[in-house]
Design a protein with these regions (language model features):
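Short, basic (Lys/Arg/His-rich) helix/loop patches that form interaction surfaces
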Residues: 50, 159-212, 219
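A short, glycine-centered helix-capping/turn motif at helix boundaries
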Residues: 4, 65-79, 204-205, 216
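Flexible interdomain linker/hinge and immediately adjacent N-terminus
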Residues: 5-43, 148-149
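Basic, Lys/Arg- and aromatic-enriched nucleic-acid-binding interface segment
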Residues: 39-73
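Catalytic-site neighborhood detector that most strongly recognizes the C-terminal catalytic loop/helix
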Residues: 207, 214-239
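Active-site/catalytic core of tyrosine-dependent DNA strand-transfer enzymes
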Residues: 115-184
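N-terminal DNA-binding recognition helix of tyrosine site-specific recombinases/integrases
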Residues: 1-15, 71-74, 165-172
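Conserved tyrosine-mediated DNA breakage-rejoining catalytic core shared by Y-recombinases
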Residues: 78-123, 129
Length: 243
């Protein structure tokens, strides 16, 4: 009896009934800023830079870089494996600018630099007393310390820079009657800026281009940011009649 009992493989029996199992879990929602929240955030960063350029031109550059180049927070700080420098902005023979970084999994990648991001870089560099554009091999730190020399070496410091901007933007949103949006912004993290940049660009750029700039391992990851079809699907269903 015992031998007959053991011959029945419970795992195999479960697999035989696999048609009753869910084949795909609902993917977690991408956390990102709404267009309204981003408008308040970047406007706030620009206002902060105008009021205290010695401190907040850096804030404005950090916000632009996280959004426009989909950077992870670790890609802005000095680490034992990578020290981001101005010379990592490089122009090719056609005059196109790229940013070289080492990201997740110690993988090196090139990020295409938009005209708007290039202008943001020029503004930041001029505020630091540098030439408007980097020269090959330039070793100046990408995100400088306001006290002392060298680049920022702690993700905590970057979080502090971003959080200060988020808090100020949320305060402005409340003052303008956007209380719910302000509360959601108060819960945002630095990584939301990367998600926001990807989500906006994937609406009008080829997904393969966004995938490579973001450093995604596959297009399936990038596809998670595409919600235009989902919105259109719901809009087409909204006026369906039952009777």
């Amino acid at each position: 009896i015992q031998e007959s009992y053991l011959s029945a493989n419970p795992v195999a029996q479960i697999r035989q009934k696999s048609k009753f199992l869910r084949k795909q879990q609902i993917q977690s929602k991408i956390r990102r800023l709404s267009p309204l929240q981003w408008d308040f955030v970047i406007d706030t960063a620009e206002a902060m830079a105008a009021e205290q350029p010695q401190v907040h031109e850096r804030t404005l550059f950090v916000m632009n870089a996280l959004f426009a180049m989909y950077l992870r927070i670790s890609e802005l700080v000095d680490t034992s494996r990578w020290q981001p420098q101005m010379g990592h902005f490089q122009a090719d023979q056609e005059g196109n600018w790229w940013f070289l970084t080492v990201g997740k999994g110690n993988k090196e990648r090139e990020i295409s630099v938009s005209d708007a991001m290039l202008e943001a870089l020029k503004r930041y560099r001029l505020s630091r007393g540098l030439l408007s554009l980097p020269i090959p091999g330039e070793s100046a730190p990408l995100v400088h310390k306001t006290r002392g020399k060298g680049g920022i070496g702690s993700t905590r410091q970057i979080r502090g820079i971003v959080q200060k901007c988020f808090d100020a933007a949320a305060q402005k949103m409340r003052a303008n009657g956007f209380s719910e949006d302000a509360e959601r912004l108060s819960a945002a993290t630095v990584h939301w800026l990367r998600h926001t940049g990807i989500s906006e660009d994937v609406k009008h750029r080829p997904r393969e281009h966004v995938r490579d700039d973001a450093g995604h391992g596959s297009s399936a990851i990038t596809d998670r940011y595409i919600d235009v079809e989902r919105a259109e699907r719901h809009a087409s269903a909204r006026q369906k009649l039952i009777k």
